[in-house]
UniProtKB/Swiss-Prot annotation:
Its main location: nucleus. Residues 1-72 are annotated as: Disordered. The two putative transcription factors FPSE_09188 and FPSE_09189 could be responsible for orchestrating expression of the W493 A and B biosynthesis cluster genes. W493 A and B consist of six amino acid residues D-allo-thr, L-Ala, D-Ala, L-Gln, D-Tyr, and L-Val/L-Ile linked to a 3-hydroxy-4-methyltetradecanoic acid polyketide chain. This is Probable transcription factor FPSE_09188. Signal peptide: none annotated. Residues 7-20 have a biased composition (Low complexity). The keyword Phosphoprotein does not apply. Keywords: DNA-binding, Nucleus, Transcription, Transcription regulation. It is found in: Nucleus. GO terms for molecular function: DNA binding. The keyword Flavoprotein does not apply. Belongs to the bZIP family. It comes from the Eukaryota.
Length: 406
């Protein structure tokens, strides 16, 4: 069996022992190149038997070069630099892998509280590792806004700008691009948000022009009211915008109001109404039909505001003249009498229908008549003598009527 031959350089033919792969016997390489060639020539006559090599002595038979066989395996002379390699991986110093701090302006955590970088480096030299630790310490001490501003590939660069806008109470137009928030009103007048409509009337430009119906007089009246109101508002608006420091402007304002009222009265007359009151009554009667909300509002007004109105009229009548006050009081008395008699009739009808009711005796009727005659000295008592419907009223109910009247 012919053995393979190998060509090995002279630098590798050093007298150095090579450990066996199995660790049983060291193998000594040949030191003479001619000897190796001779052995190679002698090795051509070898058979397939395995031969041993003594430790410390050169091998008698070896292939061409520095290769030898030990335990059936071919051994080679390897330099010392290749026998114990020290593999070190260096990371580029310009590309430092670190975890950026959180995006918090007030983040002042210590180095020990932060987590380690998620990108570890293998076999980093001491100088590079120290540089990384210094950079991490610097990144932990500075605010996150400065760190993010110095990172070129970070997608958000407006940290300092946002902080400045927060300090300026969001007055920067780039934060709120809407002109309705940042810009001023300009030449437009400020909106009227107060309840006082007499001092600052609303602009008539926002009102829609009403549609006039020729067949319905109320619709014509509504259109006339809108037209007159528009003219009046326009005159009031002009008077408000104009300087009112002189008396001439005040007179012009009064003339404008009178012109507006005259136009309203002409429109009321053209619509077929006798007066402005009748037009207003017709307007509210027509508007209240089918409007449940307005009907409920009218009920509440009768229950709450009508008594207040009557009380105000009664107090205001104290300052009127005698004849003016007398007519007003007579009308109130007549209305009160009608209300009382209506209530008494309902009461008597209820007593007649009751099974325990007793007819009114003659004595009770005479007592009631006598009680009425005692009040003849009163100048207003003649008003009660003219009514003969009280003869059939019992004495106790008649007393109730007199107490209510006086």
């Amino acid at each position: 069996m012919e053995l393979p031959t190998y060509a090995v350089s002279q630098s590798l033919l050093a007298s150095r022992s090579v450990s066996s792969p199995r660790g049983d016997q060291p193998v000594r390489a040949a030191t003479n190149g001619t000897q190796g060639q001779g052995q190679g020539q002698d090795g051509q006559n070898l058979t397939g038997k395995r031969k041993r090599t003594n430790p410390g002595y050169p091998s008698r038979e070896s292939p061409k070069g520095s290769s030898s066989r030990c335990n059936g395996l071919t051994q080679y002379a390897v330099p010392a630099s290749f026998q114990s390699p020290q593999i070190v991986q260096y990371s580029p110093p310009n590309q430092i892998l670190r975890t950026p701090p959180s995006n918090d302006v007030d983040d002042q955590l210590s180095v020990n509280s932060r987590s380690e970088p998620v990108y570890p480096t293998l076999g980093v030299p001491g100088a590079v590792r120290q540089t990384q630790e210094q950079l991490q310490l610097h990144a932990a001490r500075i605010p996150a806004s400065h760190f993010l501003n110095n990172v070129p590939n970070f997608g958000y660069h407006s940290t300092d700008k946002d902080v400045a806008m927060k300090q300026n109470y969001f007055s920067d137009s780039t934060f709120f691009p809407s002109p309705a928030i940042t810009d001023t009103w300009g030449e437009l007048p400020a909106p009227d948000l107060s309840w006082e409509t007499t001092t600052r009337p609303h602009s008539p430009g926002n009102r829609a022009t009403p549609t006039v119906d020729k067949h319905v007089s109320v619709s014509a009246f509504e259109a006339a009211l809108e037209t007159g109101e528009l003219a009046s508002d326009r005159s009031i608006q002009n008077a408000y915008n104009a300087p009112s420091t002189t008396g001439d402007n005040h007179l012009e304002t009064l003339v404008s109001i009178q012109d507006g009222l005259s136009q309203v009265l002409k429109a009321v007359e053209a619509a077929g109404f006798d007066s402005l009151d009748s037009a207003v009554i017709a307007y509210y009667q027509r508007s209240s039909k089918g409007n449940e909300w307005l009907r409920q509002e009218q009920r509440l007004n009768r229950m709450r505001r009508l008594p207040v109105l009557l009380k105000e009229l009664h107090l205001a009548a104290q300052g009127w003249g005698q004849w003016e006050r007398r007519n007003f009081q007579e009308q109130i008395i007549k209305s009160t009498e009608d209300i009382l008699f209506a209530e008494l009739q309902d009461h008597l009808a209820t007593r007649r229908n009751s099974p325990h009711a007793s007819p009114c005796s003659i004595e009770q009727r005479s007592q009631a008549r006598q009680h009425m005659m005692e009040h003849d000295a009163d100048p207003e008592a003649e008003f009660y003598d003219t009514s003969h419907g009280t003869e059939g009223i019992p004495a106790d109910e008649m007393l109730h009527v007199n107490l209510l009247l006086y």
